[in-house]
Amino acid sequence: ANGERIAAKSCVLAAGGFESNREWLREAWGQNERGEWPADNFLIRGTAYNKGVLLKHLLEDHGADRIGDPTQAHMVAIDARAPLYDGGICTRIDCVSLGVVVNRNGERFYDEGEDFWPKRYAIWGRLVAQQPGQIGYSIIDSKAIGRFMPPVFPGVKADTLTELAQKLGLPVDTFTRTLDAYNAACRVGTFDHTTLDDCHTEGVAPAKTHWARPIDTGPFYGYALKPGVTFTYLGLHTDDTAAVRFNNQPSPNLFVAGEMMAGNVLGKGYTAGVGMSIGTAFGRIAGTQAAQAALKQKQAPALIHKAQTATNTGANHASA
């Protein structure tokens, strides 16, 4: 108040990543070999306000140690009709492993049955981001209905695969060849979507390792997919005390939790629930360490060189 600056005895930073900062995403992803700027086509699954302001302040203005690849993120394939922000979980398309995914050229590009969906759903946004136009199409038939969480928008429905390709705006000839080749390659054993079953393909690339069944039972459904970013992995380097590190030295009273330090745990890929686990575990660690640091002091000391302003900023942010 009245311009008075209150120095904190300790501070916990928990201000999230930069997934809503479209300029930063664009800078990180750059321009691809097709002349596209992939990040321009990303959708943000959550708030429009996680812009990484405090993260950038620590990294660029105060020399905090960083960890993680700025292009790595929890990135899900979501319905292309989802809003730019705040679409949430109901826009996620969870039928990928029950069918095939093609790009806008009508071609498959990855093993849809590589592993259980909770271990693979968060790589599909990145896979779609690498495709022309940053768009893909999840294709299923009526056998898949009832086996996945239905999204908020219904799929495009057609009685034939040719009609489906036309409705999705895909090249009919290529799409038909892709589906015919996949169907012919399916070696159906005992289908069980709850296990890594023996239904696979042979003689087609990319292979489908599990849950491969011909897409031959109408009606057929298609969902256009875009990359949906949940949170980014670039963060502040820390250790098991959750202390922010400067020049590889831990700060005595500046700590971090949640997405701001996710890169210490997540390099690439994801398993369902890890994000909440990071927030829960390191939130408790950081809070405990910050309380202990504050108790050791009768008044707020200076942080290590270059970190004083960062602490004040964090304290002001935390008390806002």
Each model region followed by its residue ranges:
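Short acidic/polar mixed-charge low-complexity motifs
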Residues: N2-E4, E107
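Glycine-rich loop(s) and the adjacent beta-strand/alpha-helix scaffold that form part
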Residues: E4-I78, M276, I285
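Mobile, glycine/GP-rich and aromatic-enriched active-site lid/loop segments adjacent to catalytic centers
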Residues: E23, R45-K51, K56-Y270
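N-terminal low-complexity, intrinsically disordered patches enriched in charged
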Residues: L25-R26, D115, A272, F282, ...
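Internal hydrophobic alpha-helix adjacent to the cofactor/substrate pocket in enzyme cavities
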Residues: H57-D65, T176, I278-A300
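Active-site-proximal substrate-binding core of FAD-dependent oxidoreductases
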Residues: R66-A80, T288-A320
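Conserved mid-domain beta->alpha element of the FAD-binding
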Residues: K268-I278
